Amino acid sequence: MRLRCAVLDDFQGVATEVADWSRLPVDVVPFREHIRDEDALAAALGDFDIVVTLRERVPFPGSLISRLPRLKLIVASGMRNSVIDYEAAKAHGVTVCGTASSSTPPVEMTWALILGLARGVVQESNALRQGGPWQSTLGADLHGARLGLLGLGKIGSRVAQVGLAFGMRVGAWSRNLTAERAAATGVELAASKEELLADSDFVSVHLALGERSRGLIGAPELALMKPTAYLVNTSRAAIVDQDALLAALRNRSIAGAGVDVFDVEPLPAGHPMRSAPRLLATPHLGYVSRGNYATYYGQAVENIEAYLAGSPVRQLP
């Protein structure tokens, strides 16, 4: 019997285009629609030996893994995944592997949102196409404005470099950030999270999700921001209190927000984030680029080959 491989959340239908799966002695079955319910997942994946999953969209708790008797290998894009129960996988003889992931696409996505907000691109384009007013917004200048970064890691530091190229004043804060590290990137270390929020014209989130960062930006923090300031989150949804952000947008306490990550993905129809005012929202596109997908799926093929040869690579955790 040939092995079967499920490729989850292949929304664009490109998984089999960007990598050569033909060299595998495996039947590859892409799933175009997201499966949220655990019972539905158990039913859909019950006769698969291998599952390829994107990011952290589909949790694999022990309760699901135990219901997949044929499952032997999970390949997750990226080298960090907090929604897979590794102990349960080990107990059931399931190997878990990851892939490389480029920091370039999320940096570019961050700037797409910042520029879109600053120049009212979506609003002006929609007005032009729909016969609306000719020029209805007044763009926010980037040159001379302050960009505040929550997090100065691999992605945050590259976002900072672009901000500096635009002539922005760039500040950064995280609990572990030192003045020396900030200076090495060419940015200022903010005195505190509160100071960064209060004095920045654009605030962009670039932190890993953990217990200390979960809910880091809530109603009190949003209240510190200028009414002319914008918040951008391309990192992890749970870092920003979504309800508090919705309230801030509705109350006009901030000028707007750019959001690429959500508490529930894909967003259900009728979800308030789909219709919030002054929100530039995108369906988690930060990692979605042809180059990144070629890496994800190309290395997924390599991982499957290595596993079948008895020498797994890029094992997690």
Residue ranges and their predicted role:
Residues 1-97, 218, 224:
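An N-terminal-biased, well-structured beta-alpha scaffold segment characteristic
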Residues 10, 152-153:
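Glycine-rich Rossmann-fold phosphate-binding loop(s) that bind the pyrophosphate
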Residues 26, 94, 187-188, 278-279:
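Short, conserved active-site loop motifs that form the nucleotide-linked donor/cofactor pocket
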Residues 43-46, 56-64, 176-272:
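Rossmann-like adenosine-cofactor binding region
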Residues 50-53, 76, 204-205, 233, ...:
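Redox-cofactor binding/interface segments in oxidoreductases and associated redox assembly factors
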Residues 92-94, 98-146, 150, 161, ...:
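Phosphate-binding beta-alpha-beta segment of Rossmann-like dinucleotide-binding domains, i.e.
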Residues 96, 228-317:
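Rossmann-like dinucleotide-binding domain for NAD(H)/NADP(H)
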Residues 156-157:
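N-terminal Rossmann-fold NAD(P) dinucleotide-binding loop
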